[in-house]
């Protein structure tokens, strides 16, 4: 058997693909099919039973049912066994597949060996090959041929050998000679002269017709021509779509036809040409005809027409049919005919034109049909172009009759004739005349003005009546010139009008103007118009002349009455542009409601107006008819306009053709100079002398120079609404009213003069001497292109030496700018100018007086202040220790008073900004700059110290925790008096006395009655003792002795009449002689105190002109909101008509209407009781203000002896050369026995045994005040907390003590105990007695002392709980560090006191939690650190309001909050990566269970669930001792064993969400972390997500996790609130902490 491949089966018949070997060896069935079979069988048997059983007996039915159930059960048991076995069948199946594969391989090897053996033994023995023809095969394979092929086969199949190339060349060369001989000997047509002979054939070519090839078949002369090839050259490139015009069948037909005709023809070549030439001409005519039809159909419509078409003969087409219909001359029309030559058919197509055209143009037209591109469109275009040139030449000839010396141009395709109408003229302004190629009609337009209204009329004249062209071109010339005027003025503030409603007499020169004129309205000058009259030059019509007229008009209306011209019987001219005659209906209908009445007119000489600065204006007379000018009466405006002249002649500039330089120059000249004319007229009306309008040197600009400026007048206060109402009532009253009543009403309604600084004649003359020149110029603002008035005031030098580098020269220029208003608003510009001038004058009055004092060495002003800049409008003074802060002084023209603007240095703001209103009022009352400088110098240091107090608003201070309250609120009262409010509860009154001293008293007490307390504030208990710790007796007495040495007693007595003038005005704050403006520190008088200012003697600052923000008008301690005129020191000042203070008065007058006499109140008053307009107020005395008193700083000196009287000299210090030393002395009207206190009240450190001891001022040095206000660490180093000022710590401690007292009175379970020690709060709760007191050493912190009281047995018979000393010590320490600590929140104290009310066993567990909070290092192995939270933070679960107390007891259940923080447990793990949770805990005293307070949520947070589950598991599994509270064991177990579900996390990347809120938080001791300054904000590069089990914004603020080398912060002191201070560097933490949490 032949061998077969294995793929075909072969001997191995059982071969199957891999993986299917088991299918033949075993009967396999899918398990699903098997289950189907079993179910079907069971269903079938069940169906049979259902059908058969009803027929059987009961026993048989039972037997059948049993058999069915048994068999079915056995079947399904087997199926179940099979299914269970199928779980392991895969291993057996794999083994079976391997065995099958190995069997198949073995079988293949055996079969292969058998097959090879059979082939070798049987098949190959008998194998043989046939005899092949080896030689023939070799020959064919090697040579490619077979030489032994029989001849019979070779002759029939193999072709003969071709001739050789040499024989071919010889034959063709011989044939060429034969053809050439025939052509030479025969006759040849001229059209066939173009031929070529090559390759045994001759090819004739007739251009644009055909190309034919012929040859001969022998060299005999009788052998006919043989036609080889025909190629037609006629093409239709426009409509042929690239296809051949002659079909190949047609070419074959023509080929056969010509071949048949030339066989027997004697002149065969002529016959060939004739046939082909006729056919090509017919084809060309057909192509042209087809193109013409397509043109008519697609584009030209009826503009062309095929008049005649004879196939193969002619084609006639007519064009310009519209012109043919309108032009009577063209009777035959415009036609062209394409035809063959009837005489000589051999010629090409000819074109005939009707009418005829020149030979040259005709030859060009013939090219359209004798070129490669056969096109009827080209023929028509060229013909129309030739016709258009002819028509345009005719028009040109007509125009040359009246437009000579004009350059005409005919150019372009289609041809255009350009005609310039002006000289110079833009190409776009030429008249373009062309011929419509479709109709032959003439068209014209001006490219630049396509909307020209003259063009339709001119086009009609070109096609019909050429006689109108001259007039129309002239009108076009004027029209284009008007458009040029518009183009020229497009960037100038003017607009052109063709018509304006002008009213003038018929004899007015405007009526004699020509019809062509342009009206120009100036935008900025509504009362002036410019008329430009246009005329053509007679010698050269293309050039225009311009005449300018300036017309002054007045807007009027028809209702105003008839004009004087009408009244005189002369009808007015209604329109200057030429309208209908007046009186006609159409004229009345077209008459505008508003018109312009012509007042005067001035004609400009164009040459003079455009050359030179001294322009002469030619003014023609109205009655003059000639061109000469005669004089007439000139109006004031004409006189002003006669001064108008442009700058000097500029270099000639080449302008574009559309630009009219004369017009632009005149318009710009008018626009530039008319404002100056109007301004000069306004100056003249106000009697301000000026030098008229001038041109500056080198023609740079125009300038209006003022000779001088007037002295400012005191401004008038606007009338009040009541006065305006009275005026209206008086106007409505009849004229018969009583004259007296009307006079009284008029005097009452007169405007009152505003109080301004008096301008002394000497000061005014000094200012005018320095004023060198005043110039007014016009400028353009480059930013918004608006015009401005620039006023330049040049002064000589400066009265004050300035440090500014630009103010060193002797020429000082001041520039003031104003917006250029319209003509009707020019008075506003002058008002602004005079207002700014008053700004300079009033400031100079201050500077002039200040200059004398500044240069006086005795006043030592240069050491106090440096003049940074004085620009005559602003004065900038630098002061301070390093001269780094400044004050800017200027006059406010709107408010009519001086303004002060304080600016700080590079490091801080200016502390005087808070006193700006008071200092500003003092300056505007006294007008003494030196006083203000002294005040700034003396009060800079204390104000800078006070400015260090924090003014941050805090929440949870009031009962409503959401209302913010300022920590410190500074309320200025006068330049030397201010109040400081702490959290809206306490108030301190600080008075600056000069000489480095100040006084502080309790501002809660009234100045008039120590037993009376201001309603808004609460007395500060212990203030006197606290301040006495900072009193420096040596510094106080040293300053006092220096003052006595520098200021000896004055020999002048108080009875001296000259002393009385120095004591008028409101007394300063406590000692103020400076309050009234005359009693200045330079007046020589030390000043007299008011009756209510017995304490502060020498400080004579201004009266407090601004009431406190929280003043009560019904309280004597606060000034009335409208009665600040009396000053802080006295009720109405000192002086006046029989009032308090002036000369010696009786003691009966020394009282206020709202307060008892001052001798009974040795404490200062904040404000006076008199109104500003009270007659008891003394007026300033210029004599006293400028008196040469020598005392420089005496008003800042003060004494400290505690006397209620001012430290006055025995006599007033008006004696020349007397320094006027202030010392204790009884004032007039009071005897020395009225002294209430002595100096020991100031110097003693013993706390006075009076409740109003704080009302007595305490004298401190500025250094002590700075110590009070500067933030410093706590005096006790072991007490943690942020850096606060001692004053804030003291007030905060007093505030917390007051809150404790309030809570004790409110809580029934707390019993207050009376204490003999002042300032100590003693109370008891349960069996413990608590004592809260201020630290006696520094009085900056509260401390708690707890003692156990001896108690009898309880009500239930049990002995009282005995507290361990260590537990009580923990409670005291917790109070010191967590409760009475910043930020001093009442809720913290409330939480602590509620904790004290709890049962002893609960309180004991709370103390254990406090122990872990304060000392977490005591317990080792805790996973969490705990912190007791006493105030609800914003991040807590919304169970109780934010900021309120955290300990609540209700129905034997106690709610409290703790915060736990995970101790770092991974390497390199930091505190900022730790998890912090705020847990609201609930302790049930009945059940003794401690659980987590959870909100009822469908999906509680994961961490909440973990903590809650942990506490439930503890309550279920823990075993407590009898009577043991589960509170602390539950918390301790939580700290020891709580493990979160997702521990351990990656360091720094744990993100968790608890309660649906994710909050970032930092670690302890870092900014933003626990103890950081942000307390719960992002701290560090990795934000921490804090869970919301009520999570805190700053975890474990007080947890000492860094103590003992562990890196936890020291216990914080931020009121027990989460977010307190972090650990300091001494506790091992990385950084110190700051306040945190929601303050």
From Swiss-Prot:
Gly residues: bias regions: 1062-1088, 1122-1142, 1558-1579, 1604-1639
KW Transcription (keyword) present: yes
Stretches with biased composition (Pro residues): 711-721, 1219-1229
UniProt family annotation: Belongs to the Mediator complex subunit 14 family.
Motif (LXXLL motif 1): 49-53
Entry-linked Pfam families: Med14, Med14_C, RM2_Med14, RM3_Med14, RM5_Med14, RM6_Med14, RM8_Med14
Region (Disordered), start-end ranges: 561-586, 709-755, 1039-1243, 1558-1639
MF annotations from Gene Ontology: transcription coregulator activity
Entry function: Component of the Mediator complex, a coactivator involved in the regulated transcription of nearly all RNA polymerase II-dependent genes. Mediator functions as a bridge to convey information from gene-specific regulatory proteins to the basal RNA polymerase II transcription machinery. Mediator is recruited to promoters by direct interactions with regulatory proteins and serves as a scaffold for the assembly of a functional preinitiation complex with RNA polymerase II and the general transcription factors.
Motif LXXLL motif 2 positions after renumbering to this chain: 768-772
GO cellular component annotations of the record: core mediator complex; mediator complex
One of the GO biological process terms: regulation of transcription by RNA polymerase II
Biased composition (Low complexity): 575-586, 722-748, 1589-1603
Biased amino acid composition, Polar residues: 1189-1201
Cited InterPro entries: Med14_C, Med14_N, Med14_RM2, Med14_RM6, Med14_RM8, Mediator_Med14, RM3_Med14, RM5_Med14
UniProt keyword annotation of Transcription present: yes
Gene coding for it: MED14
Quaternary structure and partners: Component of the Mediator complex.
Protein name: Mediator of RNA polymerase II transcription subunit 14
Alphabetical keyword list: Activator, Nucleus, Repeat, Transcription, Transcription regulation
Cell compartments where the protein resides: Nucleus
Lineage top rank: taxon: Eukaryota
PANTHER family (UniProt xref): MEDIATOR COMPLEX SUBUNIT, MEDIATOR OF RNA POLYMERASE II TRANSCRIPTION SUBUNIT 14
């Amino acid at each position: 058997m032949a061998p077969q491949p294995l793929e075909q089966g072969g001997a191995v018949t059982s071969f199957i693909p891999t993986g299917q070997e088991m299918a033949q060896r075993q009967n396999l069935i899918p398990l699903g099919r098997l289950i189907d079979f079993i179910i079907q069988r069971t269903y079938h048997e069940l169906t049979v039973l259902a059908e058969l059983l009803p027929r059987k007996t009961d026993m048989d039915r039972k037997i059948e049912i049993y058999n069915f159930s048994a068999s079915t059960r056995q079947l399904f048991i087997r199926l179940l066994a099979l299914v269970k076995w199928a779980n392991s069948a895969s291993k057996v199946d794999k083994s079976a597949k391997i065995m099958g594969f190995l069997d198949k391989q073995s079988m293949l090897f055996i079969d292969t060996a058998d097959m090879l053996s059979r082939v070798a033994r049987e098949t190959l023995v008998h194998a043989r090959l046939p005899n092949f023809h080896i030689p023939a095969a070799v020959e064919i394979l090697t040579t490619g041929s077979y030489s032994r092929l029989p001849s019979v086969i070779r002759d029939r199949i193999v072709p003969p050998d071709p001739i050789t190339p040499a024989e071919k060349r010889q034959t063709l060369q011989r044939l060429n000679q034969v053809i050439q001989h025939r052509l030479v000997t025969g006759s040849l047509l001229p059209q066939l002269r173009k031929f070529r002979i090559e390759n045994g054939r001759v090819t004739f070519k007739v251009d644009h017709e055909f190309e034919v090839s012929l040859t001969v078949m022998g060299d005999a002369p009788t052998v006919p021509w043989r036609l080889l090839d025909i190629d037609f050259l006629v093409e239709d490139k426009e409509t042929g779509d690239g296809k051949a015009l002659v079909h190949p069948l047609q070419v074959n037909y023509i080929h056969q036809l010509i071949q048949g005709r030339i066989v027997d023809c004697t002149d065969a070549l002529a016959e060939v040409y004739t046939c082909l030439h006729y056919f090509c001409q017919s084809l060309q005519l057909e192509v042209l005809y087809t193109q013409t039809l397509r043109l008519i159909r697609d584009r030209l419509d009826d503009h062309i027409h095929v008049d005649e078409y004879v196939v193969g003969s002619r084609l006639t087409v007519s064009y310009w049919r519209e012109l043919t219909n309108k032009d009577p001359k063209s009777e035959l029309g415009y036609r062209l005919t394409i035809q063959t030559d009837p005489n000589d058919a051999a010629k090409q197509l000819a074109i005939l034109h009707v009418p005829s055209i020149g030979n040259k143009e005709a030859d060009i037209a013939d090219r359209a049909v004798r070129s490669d591109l056969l096109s009827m469109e080209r023929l028509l275009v060229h013909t129309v172009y030739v016709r258009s040139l002819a028509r345009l030449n005719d028009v040109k000839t007509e125009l040359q009759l009246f437009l000579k010396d004009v350059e005409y141009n005919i150019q372009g395709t289609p041809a255009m004739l350009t005609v310039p109408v002006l000289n110079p003229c833009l190409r776009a302004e030429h008249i373009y005349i062309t011929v419509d190629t479709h109709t032959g009609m003439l068209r014209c337009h001006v490219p630049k003005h396509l909307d020209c209204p003259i063009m339709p009329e001119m086009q009609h004249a070109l096609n019909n009546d050429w006689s109108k062209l001259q007039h129309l071109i002239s009108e076009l010339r004027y029209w284009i010139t008007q458009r040029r005027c518009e183009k020229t003025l497009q960037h100038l503030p003017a607009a052109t009008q063709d018509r304006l409603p002008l009213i003038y007499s018929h004899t007015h020169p405007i009526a004699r103007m020509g019809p062509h004129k342009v009206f120009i309205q100036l935008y900025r000058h509504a009362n002036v118009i410019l008329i430009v009259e246009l005329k053509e030059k007679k010698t050269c019509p293309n050039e225009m002349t311009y005449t300018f007229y300036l017309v002054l008009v007045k807007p009027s209306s028809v209702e105003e009455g008839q004009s004087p011209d009408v009244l005189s019987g002369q009808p007015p001219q209604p329109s200057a542009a030429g309208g209908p005659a007046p009186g006609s209906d159409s004229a009345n209908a077209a008459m505008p409601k508003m018109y312009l009445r012509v007042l005067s007119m001035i004609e400009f000489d164009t040459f003079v107006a455009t050359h030179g600065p001294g322009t002469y204006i030619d003014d023609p007379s109205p009655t003059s008819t000639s061109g000469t000018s005669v004089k007439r009466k000139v109006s004031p405006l004409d006189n002003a306009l006669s001064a108008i002249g442009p700058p000097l002649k500029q270099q000639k500039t080449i302008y574009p053709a559309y630009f009219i330089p004369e017009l632009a120059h005149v318009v710009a000249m008018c626009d530039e100079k008319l404002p100056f004319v109007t301004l000069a007229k306004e100056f003249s009306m106000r009697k301000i002398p000026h030098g008229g309008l001038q041109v500056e040197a080198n023609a740079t600009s125009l300038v209006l120079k003022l000779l001088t400026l007037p002295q400012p007048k005191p401004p008038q206060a606007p009338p009040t609404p009541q006065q305006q109402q009275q005026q209206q009532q008086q106007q409505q009253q009849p004229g018969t009213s009583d004259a007296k009543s009307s006079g009284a009403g008029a005097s009452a309604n007169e405007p009152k003069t505003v109080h301004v600084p008096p301008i002394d004649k000497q000061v005014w003359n000094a200012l005018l001497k320095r004023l060198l020149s005043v110039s007014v110029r016009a400028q353009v603002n480059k930013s918004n292109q608006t015009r401005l008035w620039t006023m330049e005031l040049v002064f000589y030098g400066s009265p004050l030496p300035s440090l500014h580098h630009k103010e060193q020269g002797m020429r000082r220029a001041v520039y003031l700018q104003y917006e250029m208003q319209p003509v009707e608003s020019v008075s506003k510009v002058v008002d602004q100018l005079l207002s700014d001038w008053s700004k300079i004058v009033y400031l100079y009055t201050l500077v002039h007086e200040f200059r004398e004092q500044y240069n006086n060495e005795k006043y030592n002003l240069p050491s106090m202040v440096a003049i940074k800049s004085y620009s005559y409008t602003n004065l900038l003074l630098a002061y301070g220790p390093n001269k780094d802060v400044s004050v800017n002084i200027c006059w406010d023209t709107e408010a009519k008073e001086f303004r002060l603007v304080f600016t700080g240095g590079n490091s801080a703001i200016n502390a005087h900004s808070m006193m700006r209103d008071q200092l500003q009022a003092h300056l505007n009352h006294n007008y003494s700059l030196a006083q203000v400088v002294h005040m700034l110098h003396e009060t800079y240091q204390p104000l800078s110290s006070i400015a260090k107090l924090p003014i941050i608003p805090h929440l949870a201070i009031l009962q409503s925790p959401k209302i913010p309250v300022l920590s410190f609120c500074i309320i200025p009262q006068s330049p030397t008096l201010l109040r400081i409010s702490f959290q809206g509860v306490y108030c301190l009154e600080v008075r600056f006395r000069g000489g480095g001293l100040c006084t502080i008293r309790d501002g809660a007490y009234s100045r008039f009655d120590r037993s009376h307390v201001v309603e808004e504030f609460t007395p500060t208990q212990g203030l006197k003792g606290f301040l006495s710790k900072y009193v420096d007796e040596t510094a106080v007495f040293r300053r006092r002795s220096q003052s006595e040495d520098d200021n000896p007693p004055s020999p002048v007595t108080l009875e001296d009449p000259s002393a009385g003038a120095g004591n008028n005005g409101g007394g300063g704050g406590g000692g103020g002689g400076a309050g009234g403006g005359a009693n200045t520190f330079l007046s020589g008088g030390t000043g007299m105190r008011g009756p209510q200012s017995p304490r502060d003697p020498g400080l004579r600052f201004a009266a407090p002109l601004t009431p406190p923000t929280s003043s009560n008008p019904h309280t004597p301690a606060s000034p009335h909101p409208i009665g600040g005129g009396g000053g802080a020191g006295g009720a109405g000042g000192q002086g006046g008509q029989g009032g308090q203070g002036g000369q010696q008065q009786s003691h009966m007058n020394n009282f206020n209407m709202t307060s008892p006499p001052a001798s009974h109140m040795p404490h200062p008053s904040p404000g006076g009781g008199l109104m500003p307009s009270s007659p008891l107020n003394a007026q300033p005395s210029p004599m006293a203000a400028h008196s040469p008193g020598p005392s420089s700083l005496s008003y800042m000196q003060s004494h400290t002896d505690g006397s209620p009287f001012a430290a006055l000299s025995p006599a007033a210090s008006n004696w020349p050369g007397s320094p006027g030393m202030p010392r204790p002395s009884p004032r007039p009207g009071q005897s020395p026995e009225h002294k209430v206190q002595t100096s020991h009240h100031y110097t003693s450190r013993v706390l006075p045994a009076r409740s109003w001891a704080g009302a007595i001022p305490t004298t401190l040095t500025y250094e002590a005040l700075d110590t009070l206000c500067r933030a410093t660490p706590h005096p006790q180093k072991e007490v943690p907390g942020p850096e606060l000022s001692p004053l804030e710590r003291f007030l905060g401690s007093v505030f917390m003590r007051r809150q404790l007292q309030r809570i004790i009175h409110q809580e029934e379970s707390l019993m207050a105990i009376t204490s003999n020690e002042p300032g100590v709060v003693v109370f008891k709760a349960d069996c413990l007695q608590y004592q809260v007191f201020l630290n006696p050493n520094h009085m900056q912190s509260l401390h708690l002392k707890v003692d156990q009281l001896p108690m009898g047995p309880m009500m239930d018979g049990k002995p009282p709980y005995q507290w361990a000393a260590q537990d009580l010590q923990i409670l005291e320490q917790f109070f010191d560090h967590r409760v009475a600590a910043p930020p001093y929140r009442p809720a913290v104290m409330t939480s602590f006191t509620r904790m004290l009310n709890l049962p002893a066993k609960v309180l004991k567990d709370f103390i254990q939690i406090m122990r872990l909070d304060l000392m977490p290092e005591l317990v080792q192995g805790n996973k969490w650190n705990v912190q007791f939270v006493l105030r609800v933070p914003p991040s807590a679960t919304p169970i109780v309001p934010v900021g309120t107390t955290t300990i609540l007891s209700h129905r034997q259940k106690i709610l409290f909050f703790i915060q736990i923080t995970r101790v770092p447990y991974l390497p390199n793990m930091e505190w900022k990566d730790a998890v912090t949770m705020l847990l609201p805990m609930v302790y049930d005293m009945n059940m003794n269970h401690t659980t987590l307070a959870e909100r009822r949520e469908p999906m509680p947070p994961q961490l909440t669930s973990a903590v809650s589950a942990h506490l439930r598991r503890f309550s279920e599994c823990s075993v407590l001792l009898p009577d043991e509270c589960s509170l602390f064991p539950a918390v301790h177990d939580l700290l020891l064993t709580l493990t979160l579900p997702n521990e351990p996390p990656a360091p720094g990347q744990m993100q968790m969400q608890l309660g649906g809120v994710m909050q970032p938080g930092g670690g302890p001791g870092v900014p933003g972390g626990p103890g950081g300054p942000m307390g719960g904000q992002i701290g560090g590069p990795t934000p921490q997500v804090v869970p919301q089990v009520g999570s805190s914004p700053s975890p474990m603020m007080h947890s000492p996790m860094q103590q003992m080398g562990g890196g936890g912060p020291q216990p914080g002191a931020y009121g027990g609130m989460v977010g307190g201070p972090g650990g300091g560097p001494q506790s091992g933490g990385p950084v110190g902490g700051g306040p945190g949490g929601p303050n």
